[in-house]
């Protein structure tokens, strides 16, 4: 079967299963199995798939119809222009989380020697993206999941920045021995009531939180009062509906700080910024 014909059939199957990204998913899976860039796939529609290639592709499409994310099927997700290894042990990096990296980079000089703590590092995407852009910065990457830390280390090593990063197994800020200059965190913030099929494959510990999704955000804000250095900063990704409540909570804990909510490219309230 030609790849163009397989692609048409695959898109039909995915659409019939309400997969909104059907065309893109089929293209990504073809690129993955053929080990060719997407541009090659588009310019060579006449290529004939081998039997093994077609069997593999059909198996992947079947898994995709069951809502398994493409990132887990290919063990890859692009974030901040970098490719990261991901599997079911870590949250799949989202485009909106790039705002956390952007925000931190705007606040730090290129040759600065500040210390950053990335709490709930997961795949390490935030840590690695910052390390690639700020060569003098020291980063502490913390996670409560040992498998996640192993993946973060793997990704850091693939970009040659592992020596700049301290990987720490721990819960939130409990393992930070001295205050840090910046705390960054993309913690679980989805309320249990908002569980959806498309995120059912991702680790629940990395997605959901109690107290309407605010439990861990409130904990890290409370703990950070003794973990931030003078003139320190903290940037937390939030669930847009939480913006007002979490902002009030932050102001109560840091009455003299500059506290603001930053919006993402979709104009949704996405980042809580606290500057001492």
For the regions a protein language model found, what residue spans apply to each?
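C-terminal beta-strand of the catalytic ATP-binding
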Residues: 187, 275-276
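Hydrophobic pocket-lining residues within nucleotide cofactor-binding pockets
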Residues: 34, 172, 265
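Mobile active-site "lid"/loop adjacent to the S-adenosyl-L-methionine
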Residues: 187-216
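Short helix-capping segments at alpha-helix termini
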Residues: 19, 134-136, 158-162, 228, ...
């Amino acid at each position: 079967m030609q790849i163009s014909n397989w692609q048409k059939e695959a898109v039909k199957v995915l659409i019939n299963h309400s997969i909104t990204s059907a065309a893109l998913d089929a293209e990504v899976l073809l690129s993955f199995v053929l080990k060719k860039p997407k541009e090659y796939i588009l310019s060579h529609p006449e290529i004939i798939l081998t039997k093994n290639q077609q069997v593999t592709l059909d198996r992947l499409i079947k898994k995709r119809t069951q809502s398994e994310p493409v990132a887990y099927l290919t063990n890859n997700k692009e974030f901040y222009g970098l490719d990261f290894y991901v599997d079911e042990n870590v949250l799949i990096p989202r485009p909106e989380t790039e705002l956390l990296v952007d925000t931190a980079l705007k606040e730090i000089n290129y040759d600065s020697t500040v210390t950053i703590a990335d709490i709930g590092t997961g795949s390490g995407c935030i840590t690695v993206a910052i390390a690639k852009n700020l060569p003098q910065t020291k980063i502490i990457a913390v996670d409560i999941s040992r498998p996640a830390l192993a993946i973060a280390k793997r990704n850091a090593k693939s970009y040659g920045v592992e020596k700049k990063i301290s990987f720490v197994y721990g819960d939130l800020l409990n393992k930070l021995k001295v205050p840090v200059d910046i705390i960054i965190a993309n913690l679980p913030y989805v309320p249990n009531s908002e569980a959806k099929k498309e995120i059912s494959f991702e680790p629940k510990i990395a997605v959901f939180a109690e107290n309407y999704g605010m439990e861990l955000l409130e904990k890290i804000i409370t703990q950070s009062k003794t973990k931030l250095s003078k003139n320190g900063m903290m940037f937390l990704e939030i669930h847009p509906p939480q913006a007002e409540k979490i902002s009030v909570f932050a102001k109560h804990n840091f009455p003299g700080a500059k506290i603001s909510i930053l919006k993402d490219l979709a104009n949704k309230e996405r980042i809580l910024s606290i500057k001492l």
